[in-house]
C-alpha cells in the first residue's frame, strides 16, 4: 500500500494493527507576493529557478518523506491568511516565504502566531545581507525558525525540518487497556 501511495502521490489511509487510523502528515507551503516571478525577477539575487520548479522539487521531496504537501502562491496578504485559516485544523506544519510582506505583514504575522502547528520562514536570499530596510523581518518572531540565503535549497531544507517538527508534535495514539 505504501508503494501505491507513492505512485499515486496521495495519502492512503489504513487502519493500523490496533485499529487506529494512520493519516499522512499534511504540510502547507505559502509563497508571498511576486514569487510567481522567480526565474525572471532579479536572477542575480534569486537565481533562475522558477516557482514551478521549486514546487516540483518540494513535491518530489514530500513523496520521499511520505508527507502530503500543498503549495500556494498569492500576491495578496489576505489570501495567504485565508489559506492558513482554512487549514488550521488539517495541517501539521507550514513553510512561509512572506516575500514583500516580510517587513510589513502585520496581519500575516498575527495569523501565523494563531496557528497550532509549527511554521518556518524561508527566503531564497539572505535578507540580512541586502538593503538595510530588508534586514528586519516582522514575521520572524511569529515562527519557529528561519532559513535564508540558500536559494531554492532554503525551501527543501525547510520542508525536511518542518516534516520532522510536525512528526514530533503529532499526538500518539492512546493505548487501550483490555
Residue ranges of each PLM-predicted region?
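Short, acidic/small-residue loops that bind anionic groups at enzyme active sites
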Residues: 113-130
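Glycine- and acidic-residue-enriched helix-capping/strand-helix junction motifs
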Residues: 38-52
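Short beta->alpha junction loops
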Residues: 70-78
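Extreme N-terminal starter segment of soluble prokaryotic enzymes
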Residues: 24-27
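Short, glycine-/small-residue-rich phosphate/pyrophosphate-handling segment
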Residues: 129-171
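Short acidic/histidine-rich motifs immediately flanking catalytic phosphotransfer sites
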Residues: 87-94
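Short glycine-rich anion-binding loops that position phosphate/pyrophosphate groups of nucleotides
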Residues: 33-35, 99-102, 125-127
Amino acid at each position: 500500500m505504501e508503494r501505491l501511495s507513492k505512485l499515486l502521490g496521495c495519502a492512503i489511509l489504513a487502519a493500523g494493527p490496533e485499529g487506529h487510523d494512520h493519516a499522512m502528515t499534511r504540510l502547507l507551503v505559502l509563497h508571498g507576493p511576486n514569487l510567481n516571478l522567480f526565474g525572471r525577477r532579479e536572477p542575480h539575487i534569486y537565481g533562475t529557478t522558477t516557482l514551478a520548479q521549486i514546487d516540483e522539487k518540494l513535491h518530489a521531496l514530500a513523496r520521499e518523506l511520505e508527507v502530503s504537501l500543498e503549495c500556494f502562491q498569492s500576491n495578496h496578504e489576505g489570501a495567504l491568511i485565508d489559506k492558513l485559516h482554512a487549514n488550521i485544523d488539517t495541517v501539521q506544519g507550514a513553510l512561509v516565504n512572506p516575500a514583500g510582506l516580510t517587513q510589513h505583514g502585520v496581519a500575516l504575522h498575527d495569523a501565523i502566531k494563531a496557528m497550532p502547528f509549527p511554521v518556518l520562514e524561508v527566503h531564497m536570499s539572505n535578507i540580512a545581507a541586502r538593503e538595510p530596510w530588508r534586514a528586519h523581518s516582522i514575521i520572524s518572531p511569529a515562527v519557529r525558525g528561519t532559513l535564508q540565503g540558500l536559494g531554492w535549497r532554503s525551501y527543501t531544507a525547510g520542508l525536511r525540518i518542518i516534516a520532522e517538527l510536525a512528526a514530533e508534535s503529532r499526538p500518539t495514539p492512546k493505548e487501550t487497556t483490555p
